[in-house]
């Protein structure tokens, strides 16, 4: 089974867009002479571009996930996966790349995820708004 799904980080995008707007308002109130605001705007735009979405792919013999245009790409062999299950994260784990009590979490929005445990014992979670679809794709492709 081939699977590809991209989740947009809608709330994250809104928060970053509001932060960019705030920086521009501050710069405007300072007569557009606020280099710190410009630096912050550039940084926020880069973060928005890199972390605005999370794509997950299951194809052939691999599970892949990456943020935005291919940032922080991770690839795992399906034969290395021992178990996979649908989970719900605590809101406290947040978005982005986080170390949690359950291993690394890669997430852009929401609380739903699929937890993967490798034969090596390593565990990680991939946040998704399609946990059933991802779980089905992984489960059907594990040798």
Q: Predicted regions span which residues?
A:
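N-terminal membrane-targeting/pre-transmembrane regions
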Residues: 1-31, 105-106, 111-113, 123, ...
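Alpha-helical transmembrane segments of multipass membrane proteins
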Residues: 24, 45-46
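Soluble, non-transmembrane catalytic domains of enzymes that act on hydrophobic metabolites at membranes
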Residues: 24-27, 61-62, 66, 76, ...
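Short, aromatic-rich membrane-interface segments at the entry and exit
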Residues: 31-40
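Hydrophobic alpha-helical segments and helix-packing faces
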Residues: 36-37, 56, 74
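Transmembrane-cytosolic junction motif
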Residues: 46-62, 66-67
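Non-transmembrane, membrane-adjacent beta-strand/coil modules in membrane-associated proteins
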Residues: 52, 66-129
């Amino acid at each position: 089974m081939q699977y590809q799904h991209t989740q947009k980080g809608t709330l994250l995008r809104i928060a970053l867009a509001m932060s960019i707007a705030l920086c521009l308002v501050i710069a405007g109130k300072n007569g557009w002479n606020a280099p710190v605001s410009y630096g912050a705007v550039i940084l926020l735009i880069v973060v928005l571009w890199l972390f605005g979405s999370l794509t997950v792919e299951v194809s052939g013999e691999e599970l892949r996930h990456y943020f935005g245009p291919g940032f922080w790409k991770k690839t795992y062999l399906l034969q290395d996966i021992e178990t996979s299950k649908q989970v719900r994260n605590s809101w406290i784990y947040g978005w982005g790349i986080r170390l949690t009590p359950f291993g690394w979490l890669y997430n852009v929005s929401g609380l739903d995820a699929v937890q993967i445990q490798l034969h090596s014992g390593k565990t990680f979670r991939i946040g998704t708004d399609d946990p059933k679809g991802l779980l089905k794709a992984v489960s059907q492709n594990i040798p």
